Every structure is written in structure tokens, then in C-alpha cells.
Amino acid sequence: IRLLCSDWHINYSAKKLKGKVKDKLALQKEFGLPQRKDVPVLAMVSRLTAQKGFQLVVSEMQNLVQFDVQVIVLGTGDANFEHDFRYFADTYPGKVGAAITFDVGLAQRIYAGADMFLMPSAFEPCGLSQMISMRYGTLPIVHQIGGLQDSVQPFNPVTGEGTGFGFHDFSGFYMMQEIQEALRLYSEPAAWTKVVKQAMSQDFSWETASQEYLNMYNELV
């Protein structure tokens, strides 16, 4: 994850975020979307399968595009989902961009240029994408289960703490609630930037994980 954060696709850091706007505008251009730095970009990079929760996304896409947001999808998988996202890109030009392919370089450009990263997985033992997205300053919106629950701290509007957004019940309704919460926070630039910096500052190294397990063991004994 540290290596990804230092690749040439990143032109910014937690202390200096202005370069992320350039990556965003370039990403919008690459997907044929209007180049607007003010509109939030919600991205998904994943296998297009039911295990990854794409049935929720498909069921809510009509609702999602009613908001001032651009949606980008990269991935391959179930033929029905591939068809669905091609259809959405054709039906909602300027709102939805889809690349039904596997492309590591494009995935990195999406991580770097997007504002939000959606992971509504039905189950996820570990998951890396949410950690990568945080390192890129792209806030994850996740179904709080398994590794997603362990690695993403949901935003608390009272304290301002958090590294992303999460919903407990596996349903399109609750997923949309969290997306709307993310959009609301995005409309408050100072508060949004604070959470982005908190997410980028997370340490997912093995050294940190080992120390946390050791501390937990010591507490138990």
C-alpha cells in the first residue's frame, strides 16, 4: 500500500492535496465525463459479481444519478452486470463512465482521481481496495462486514472523526443513505478535507497490525 501511494499517478500528499484535482480532471476526461472539479466522483474498481454487492448498485443506479455526482466503474465479471454498466454508461452520458476491462494502470488513476470509493460487498474476509483508496485520499463507502468493518472507521458527524462511511444492513436503501451522507460532507470542503487527511494517515503496515494483535493478547492475559 505504501508503494502504491508513492507511484507516479499521485501528485499530492496528505499535507498538500491540490494535485488531486488535476488527477480528477484527467480521469473525467479519460471517461468522457464533464471536467468539473466541484462534482464528486464515486468510483468502483472490482470484479462485477454478486459477492461484491453489485446487485445493490444496479438496483439504486436510477436514484444515484439524480444527485450531482459522477459514477465510474472499472472491472469484469458476471455478464449481466457487465451489460448493466454498459447500459448505464450509454443511458446516462455525462453521469456514468464504465470500462469493462482489467487495467491496473487505469485502476490506479481511478484511485487517484476519484473522491469516493464504493465497496458494498456481501462478504469480504479482508479486502485491500478500501485501504488503497484511503491511501489515495479517496474515501471508502463500505458495507460494514469482515475486513471492511475492521479497516474503515465510519465518519462521526458529531466528533468529525472517521476515515470513510459504512452501512450495516446489506440493502440498497442503507447504501444510498451512506452515499448521501458522503455527498453531504463533500459539500463542506473543510470538513471533507479533514476526513481525507485522516484516511490518508492510516497505517496498515504489518508492523502496526502485529503490535495491535500483541496489545490485544496482553490485555486478554
Task: Describe every region a protein language model picked out.
Residues I1-V221:
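Catalytic cores of carbohydrate-active enzymes across secretory and cytosolic contexts
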